[in-house]
């Protein structure tokens, strides 16, 4: 079955996107990403060397752009201006690469998105030729506004970044999914494989995660688990779950037509 994820006109086999931070070293980063099967990897430009500093190890030596789609992000930015400046730098470092992940944070404690600044930055970046995937609140109205601006994917949080609390508001996610004409990917809050599966069962087009893998006791094994969870959740969504019944039990084994009855 051909069931690829298409973002900005490019198709991907994997619906799991992963971050590159918080690992003990680049070797563990590469091993975990290989185990995840991810094709899109996101990189915090303000925290990770992808060529800005010639004297430091370069992540692109471990994750070559020829094999992976590098998704620069604006983690650590708290204003639209900072986010735009950061992604313009990333475009220079990556030879005109246009696909980016925008996140503008509200405060350093919750890391909740600052939506007015996010909307402002998104509008500027889209006009500047970027293909913007955007981290946002689980607000259906603002998610639709980001789509209308021209973002190529909306990425509502499941819960706070790094919290591992899972999906706290599935109803809002479903509203966002039902109205969207661009891919919807859960971003932030996934803690374990069942969270990823639930996101996919709700109808999300993909899941992005970092801490859930990097802070697991065995990151490589957790990456493998997340790969399977995303695949299983997607298949369950496509298969269509049975209706929930709060009454009138329907036994798996029929009681009529039994031998000897």
UniProtKB/Swiss-Prot annotation:
One Gene Ontology cellular component term attached to this UniProt record is: cytoplasm
Tell where it localizes.
Answer: Cytoplasm
One Gene Ontology term of the biological-process aspect is: thiamine diphosphate biosynthetic process
The UniProt record lists the EC number as: 2.8.1.10
Q: Provide the primary localization.
A: cytoplasm
Q: Which Gene3D superfamilies match?
A: Aldolase class I
Q: Does the keyword Transferase apply?
A: yes
- Tell me yes or no: is Transferase among this UniProt entry's keywords: yes
What are the alphabetically sorted keywords of the record? Cytoplasm, Schiff base, Thiamine biosynthesis, Transferase
Report the Pfam families cross-referenced here: ThiG (PF05690)
According to UniProt, the reaction catalysed is: [ThiS sulfur-carrier protein]-C-terminal-Gly-aminoethanethioate + 2-iminoacetate + 1-deoxy-D-xylulose 5-phosphate = [ThiS sulfur-carrier protein]-C-terminal Gly-Gly + 2-[(2R,5Z)-2-carboxy-4-methylthiazol-5(2H)-ylidene]ethyl phosphate + 2 H2O + H(+)
Pathway per its UniProt entry is: Cofactor biosynthesis; thiamine diphosphate biosynthesis
Which InterPro entries does the record match to this protein?
A: Aldolase_TIM, Thiazole_synthase_ThiG, ThiG
> Which Gene Ontology molecular-function terms are recorded?
thiazole synthase activity
- The organism's superkingdom is given as Bacteria
Q: Which residues constitute the catalytic centre?
A: 101
Q: Which residues bind 1-deoxy-D-xylulose 5-phosphate?
A: 162, 188-189, 210-211
- Return the SUPFAM superfamilies for the record: ThiG-like
Enzyme class (EC, first level)? transferase
Family membership noted in the UniProt record: Belongs to the ThiG family.
* Subunit structure of this chain's protein: Homotetramer. Forms heterodimers with either ThiH or ThiS.
What does the record give as the function of this protein?
A: Catalyzes the rearrangement of 1-deoxy-D-xylulose 5-phosphate (DXP) to produce the thiazole phosphate moiety of thiamine. Sulfur is provided by the thiocarboxylate moiety of the carrier protein ThiS. In vitro, sulfur can be provided by H(2)S.
Q: What is this protein called?
A: Thiazole synthase
Organism encoding this protein: Aromatoleum aromaticum (strain DSM 19018 / LMG 30748 / EbN1) (Azoarcus sp. (strain EbN1))
């Amino acid at each position: 079955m051909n069931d690829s994820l298409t973002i900005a006109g490019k198709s991907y086999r994997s619906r799991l996107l992963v971050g590159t931070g918080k690992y003990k070293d680049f070797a563990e980063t590469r091993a975990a990403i290989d185990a995840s099967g991810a094709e899109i990897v996101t990189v915090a430009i303000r925290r990770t060397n992808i060529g800005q500093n010639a004297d430091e190890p370069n992540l692109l030596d471990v994750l070559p752009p020829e094999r992976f789609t590098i998704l620069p992000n604006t983690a650590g930015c708290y204003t639209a201006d900072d986010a735009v400046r950061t992604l313009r730098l990333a475009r220079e470092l990556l030879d005109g690469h246009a696909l980016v992940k925008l996140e503008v944070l509200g405060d350093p404690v919750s890391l909740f998105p600052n939506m007015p600044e996010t909307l402002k930055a998104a509008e500027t970046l889209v006009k500047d030729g970027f293909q913007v995937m955007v981290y946002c609140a689980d607000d259906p109205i603002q998610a639709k506004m980001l789509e209308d601006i021209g973002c190529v994917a909306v990425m509502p949080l499941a819960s706070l970044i790094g919290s591992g609390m899972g999906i706290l508001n599935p109803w809002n996610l479903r509203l966002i999914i039902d109205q969207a004409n661009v891919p919807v990917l859960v971003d932030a809050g996934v803690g374990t494989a069942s969270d990823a599966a639930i996101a996919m069962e709700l109808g999300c087009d993909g899941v992005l995660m970092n801490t859930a893998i990097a802070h697991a006791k065995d990151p490589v094994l957790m990456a493998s688990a997340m790969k399977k969870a995303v695949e299983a959740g997607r298949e369950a969504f496509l298969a269509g779950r049975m209706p929930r019944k709060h009454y009138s039990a329907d036994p798996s084994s029929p009681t009529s037509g039994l031998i000897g009855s």
